[in-house]
Amino acid sequence: MSGRGGCGPCWGLLLALVLALGALPWTQGAEQEHHDEIQGFQIVTFKWHHVQDPYIIALWVLVASLAKIVFHLSHKVTSVVPESALLIVLGLVLGGIVLAADHIASFTLTPTVFFFYLLPPIVLDAGYFMPNRLFFSNLGSILLYAVVGTVWNAATTGLSLYGVFLSGIMGELKIGLLDFLLFGSLIAAVDPVAVLAVFEEVHVNEVLFIIVFGESLLNDAVTVVLYNVFQSFVTLGGDKVTGVDCVKGIVSFFVVSLGGTLVGVVFAFLLSLVTRFTKHVRVIEPGFVFIISYLSYLTSEMLSLSSILAITFCGICCQKYVKANISEQSATTVRYTMKMLASGAETIIFMFLGISAVDPLIWTWNTAFVLLTLLFVSVFRAIGVVLQTWLLNRYRMVQLELIDQVVMSYGGLRGAVAFALVALLDGNKVKEKNLFVSTTIIVVFFTVIFQGLTIKPLVQWLKVKRSEHREPKLNEKLHGRAFDHILSAIEDISGQIGHNYLRDKWANFDRRFLSKLLMRQSAQKSRDRILNVFHELNLKDAISYVTEGERRGSLAFIRSPSTDNMVNVDFSTPRPSTVEASVSYLLRESASAVCLDMQSLEQRRRSVRDAEDVITHHTLQQYLYKPRQEYKHLYSRHVLSPSEDEKQDKEIFHRTMRKRLESFKSAKLGLGQSKKATKHKRERERAQKRRNSSVPNGKLPLDSPAYGLTLKERELELSDPEEAPDYYEAEKMSGGIEFLASVTKDTTSDSPAGIDNPVFSPDEDLAPSLLARVPPWLSPGEAVVPSQRARVQIPYSPGNFRRLAPFRLSNKSVDSFLLAEDGAEHPESTHM
């Protein structure tokens, strides 16, 4: 009932809009007559002609958006019928209503609107979110299907139709060989809009999708060249075409394809370079992405190059650097705006395909020509796919099976590109233009509606491998990366230049030159693989702790940090004794659960729950993100408020990374004093004298105020100077509560921040004589001056490291020493 109630208002609004649009000419005429009759000053006037064009555009966009809402009210319909087919049917209905109200087809899909305003957002979205590795790994197969396959389809379709025409089955038509080849060139290309609309709903495997979709993108160069060549031949006449013109056509293919690709790469380089310097103008970052990408499309059109290839490779080449340079808010804006524009353009295209088909002036019917075109397009597509796949499987590591070939043959959809190209034909030169237009509309409707309806059941019946939408695990990433290096090494040793070798060389070139030029220094460091792996491991540790606590039903994972075996911890609430089992005691227990006043807990007799509250408070104080006072920003159209989540992630990562690195340095500093060290006692004494001579008075300046640094000191600089001011200025302005103690000479333990590995947790402090030892990696005659942190805090001894214990939190909180005296008084309950 709710679905029907939701559909009623939408359909009523759609009908009202269509009727209003149908009555627009009458309204305009009535307004003109009314304006001629009335004289004098008018308070309010009706100026429809002043807003007619933008108003109609806004109404059609609204109608298209409401149509998508109506379609998705019923999941059963959209799961069976593709959205593109529903939009075409809706366009036919709306076009019929407009034609009945106005008696002429007022609205059609013109080539100018399609190529300059509707197609660019769809192709840019496809290129910007293209899986680059998958695309370039299958680039050879994609190029073969796009170039050879398109030429094959165009030639075989045109020649077959011409042969049937010579037999006299089609009747008398004013068409020659060049006209048939021209029609074959425009009807042979697979349409990227139709492929995206259908294959995204089918969810085939990634390799199959990228081959079909990549073919639909890259065959634009072949289609444009063939279309222009045969159109020029038709204009010149068959008698005037020479061999030089044919050679020029072949050269034109390479110029158009390579030139369009080069234009896209140049604009991608420019876009990446511009976004590197947009730190202080974050608000306009998304504008650069859309404007520069669109300029690449227009520039290629201006130079008569492949505009689709230009904007596709612009998106492919710039995505890595742009995503690293722009802020998180800008990246989100670009992502959603690009998806919105692409989805809206796709909706308008299919709807206007249906609306344009109701124009009676464009229809010329020839049954034999239409049916034979459908037959030849389908049959020669299948033959071409089988022949090319047989050739590719001799060299491909991952074979394309027969089931994949069936889906590829069936997925050769035609769409609005073919309709726009046939609409551009000159009726004076091509006498049967209306026949070509009518046949193209039938082919588009057949492939989008019929094949779109049946491709999903076909995929299910053939049991085609489907795509898996999941994030690969860290172990899978590491193994995949290791296999890449192994395969690259094998190709290098054997002297073969394969895609693994080329990918490795390109990665080195990108890391050494392109990333340094097009990417900010902070982005280069934040994208470091080792830091990313560390971040994922740290996040995995934190999730495991929280999951364990939720599974146990309490916060027991932070109750007893000194427990050796977490399995023996009793996570249940301790049972009160007979004396304490009173109502007043229970009330006090309930109140203490929310009491955060540590002084009141210290002054009174603490129960087991109070002790747990103290431990929980100190642990959360140590590991959680430092709260800050919120401050309101004044409105500004040029500056966005800083992202608290982004700063929080960076600070937690920096603090955790600092703690881990300190643990690693501590482990490295005392790795096994060698048994042979006693033989070099004199050399050590000399080195110690040299080291003491470099320190004033032979003592460490612990009283110097320069070493009273807080743990917020920037030891681990992961951002360049241009990134630092925002982060630390916001921290200064926030004036938050300081949870971390200052490191002075009286502090014996650093406050760790983040999840710590128990392998690096010491059992006891180190003797002060550690500074007098010579690290084992130094030669007998060398000496080293301790760093500031080593002077402030003595590193941990490697001899006191525990062996690998059950996973738990570190107990090295500064505040946790307050509970040292009460450890024996309130022991944790354990399972016996």
Swiss-Prot record:
Stated consequence of mutating R527F: Fails to bind EZR. Abolishes sodium:proton antiporter activity. Abnormal trafficking
Residues spanning the signal sequence: 1-29
Membrane-traversing stretches: 51-73, 82-101, 111-128, 132-167, 181-202, 205-236, 244-278, 281-303, 306-322, 330-358, 367-388, 402-425, 433-466
Spans within the Cytoplasmic topological domain: 74-81, 129-131, 203-204, 279-280, 323-329, 389-401, 467-832
Region annotation (Interaction with AHCYL1) ranges: 591-696
Phosphoserine carried by residues: S554, S562, S592, S607, S663, S719, S813, S816
The organism's place on the tree of life at top rank: Eukaryota
Membrane topology: Multi-pass membrane protein
GO biological process: regulation of intracellular pH; sodium ion import across plasma membrane
Molecular function via GO: identical protein binding; PDZ domain binding; phosphatidylinositol binding; potassium:proton antiporter activity; sodium:proton antiporter activity
Activation and inhibition: Seems to switch between active and inactive modes in response to various stimuli. Activated directly or indirectly by membrane phosphatidylinositol (PIs). Regulated by a variety of auxiliary proteins, which facilitate the maturation, cell surface expression and function of the transporter. Inhibited specifically by the drug tenapanor.
Reactions that this protein is recorded to catalyse: Na(+)(in) + H(+)(out) = Na(+)(out) + H(+)(in)
Effect upon mutating S719D: Does not change sodium:proton antiporter activity
GO cellular component entries: apical plasma membrane; brush border; brush border membrane; cell surface; early endosome membrane; plasma membrane; recycling endosome membrane
Modifications made to the protein after synthesis: Phosphorylated by PKA, which inhibits activity. Phosphorylation at Ser-663 by SGK1 is associated with increased abundance at the cell membrane and activity. Phosphorylation at Ser-719 by CSNK2A1 regulates SLC9A3 activity through the formation of multiple signaling complexes.
Extracellular topological intervals: 30-50, 102-110, 168-180, 237-243, 304-305, 359-366, 426-432
Keywords carried by this UniProt record: Antiport, Cell membrane, Endosome, Ion transport, Membrane, Phosphoprotein, Signal, Sodium, Sodium transport, Transmembrane, Transmembrane helix, Transport
UniProt subcellular location: Apical cell membrane; Cell membrane; Recycling endosome membrane; Early endosome membrane
Listed result of changing R520F: Fails to bind EZR. Abolishes sodium:proton antiporter activity. Abnormal trafficking
Protein family membership: Belongs to the monovalent cation:proton antiporter 1 (CPA1) transporter (TC 2.A.36) family.
Protein name: Sodium/hydrogen exchanger 3
Encoding gene per record: SLC9A3
